[in-house]
Every structure is written in C-alpha cells, then in structure tokens.
Amino acid sequence: MPRRILLFMSLLFLAIATSTPIRAATPICHSTPHNYCQYHGMVKSIYVNSGNIILLYFDTPLHINSASSVGFNVSFGEAAAIYINDNPEFANLFYSTALAAQASNQPVTIQMRGEHSGYLKIDRIWLSKQ
C-alpha cells in the first residue's frame, strides 16, 4: 500500500511541476485592410454599469501605443468595452460567453475594432475548449 501512495504522490508532483498556468499574451494590434486588436487570455474580470457599458478586463494590459499605431485613440489599456445600446443582442451573448469562460477557467479570444469611452471597442469573441 505505501508503494501505491508513493507512486501517486510522485505522479501528482510531476503533474504539478510540469504544468504551466494559462497566461495571457498582451493584446496585439494588426494593420490590415480592416485594422483590429486581438486578445487571447483569461477574463480577469467583467463589469457592467448603469451607463450601459460592459468592460472586460485583460489578464495582461494592452500597450496603448500599439492601438494608436493602427489608428485607435484609446486612453485605457487594461480593458475593452461594449456599449450595450449599440447592439443589445450581441452584448447579451458577449456577456454570457465571457461569464462562461470565467466560470470554467477557459481563455477567450476577442477582437476589437474602434473605440468607445477611451477603451477599445469589442466586436467579437471566441470561447474554445482547451
């Protein structure tokens, strides 16, 4: 019996020692015919306010100069925004997808085009099983 416990503990230690936590890359911006910025990582937090804005906070902040290099004038790099009134159905789907990702500890990929209230404006989201 002690041999099984030792084997189990060794395998557990090996699994923990060799696993790497999911760490997000800094959001990056691409200059293409349709300029956009993209984030792949964890949903650090998600926030909704009475002004009808949803903010998704990045695990690793965006470098504001990266956004300005593709023509986006943003003041805040730690989050991206959705203005709910622009597209309420998309905002609802986005919020539920982001919450599902956060609850299941899965990374998301989001793309942002344009800006709103000093934040990059989110226009799509992916949730992929890891």
Task: Give names to the regions the model predicted.
Residues 8-17:
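Bacterial N-terminal signal peptides
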Residues 20-24:
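Sec/Tat signal peptide C-region and signal peptidase I cleavage site
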Residues 1-9:
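Bacterial N-terminal signal peptides that target proteins for export
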Residues 25-130:
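Exposed beta-strand/loop interface patches that mediate assembly or binding
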